[in-house]
């Protein structure tokens, strides 16, 4: 899609779906992780080695290379489906894609990690990147809120990016409502759907996404890291 570099700040409908007082699953997990680090001074291995660029995404070179080529050629899709087992980098890849598209020095396949947009995305506080837990926000009302939010242009980034984890948990009614947005998305919108059970995602949704299958990471690849 063509980027939309600016939009009205503080539009009343922008944060209907994900207000700060009710973060999605990933938001709550991120807050808990950072609190644990502050209290104990210990950072789990998974957190210390969470990839921040496509080059750091171990075991998924086929995904990294294809997404890198798409960004370099300016052929970014409106919707992606990342499927595979838990803990193989689906959400990390979605965040890296978000940083790549909205980095102040991009779009780039190597986000700088230090600009305001990159930092806010990494800390899950970007106004233009929404991380949504499909298991907790699975009903048609939540998707209607999302569709309302989509109408507003980005606050200060090129793209508004919606990362929906466990998307297969959405109800049929929610899928049908989401389909209407996928059929004619605004040029500044990118969806990234993550799932451990791609077969449960409705074919009408899958057919409108670029599907990336994440492999189980081998022990030797983890040890090498």
Residue spans for each PLM region:
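Extreme N-terminal basic, low-complexity initiation segments
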Residues: 2-11
């Amino acid at each position: 899609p063509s980027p939309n570099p600016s939009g009205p700040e503080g539009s009343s409908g922008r944060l209907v779906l994900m207000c700060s007082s009710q973060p999605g699953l990933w938001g709550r997990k991120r807050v808990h992780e950072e609190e644990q680090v502050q209290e104990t001074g210990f950072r789990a291995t998974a957190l210390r080695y969470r990839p921040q660029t496509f080059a750091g995404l171990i075991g998924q070179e086929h995904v990294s290379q294809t997404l890198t080529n798409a960004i370099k050629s300016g052929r970014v899709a409106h919707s992606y489906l990342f499927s595979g087992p838990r803990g193989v980098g689906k959400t990390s890849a979605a965040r890296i894609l978000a940083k790549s598209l909205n980095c102040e020095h991009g779009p780039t396949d190597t986000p700088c990690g230090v600009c305001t947009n990159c930092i806010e995305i990494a800390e899950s506080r970007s106004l233009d990147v929404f991380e949504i837990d499909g298991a907790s926000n699975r009903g048609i009302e939540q998707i209607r809120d999302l569709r309302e939010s989509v109408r507003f242009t980005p606050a200060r980034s090129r793209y508004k990016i919606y990362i929906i984890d466990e998307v297969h948990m959405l109800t049929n009614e929610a899928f049908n409502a989401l389909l209407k947005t996928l059929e004619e998305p605004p040029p500044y919108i990118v969806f990234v759907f993550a799932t451990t059970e791609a077969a449960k995602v409705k074919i009408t949704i899958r057919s409108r996404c670029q599907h990336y299958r994440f492999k189980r990471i081998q022990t030797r690849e983890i040890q090498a890291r």
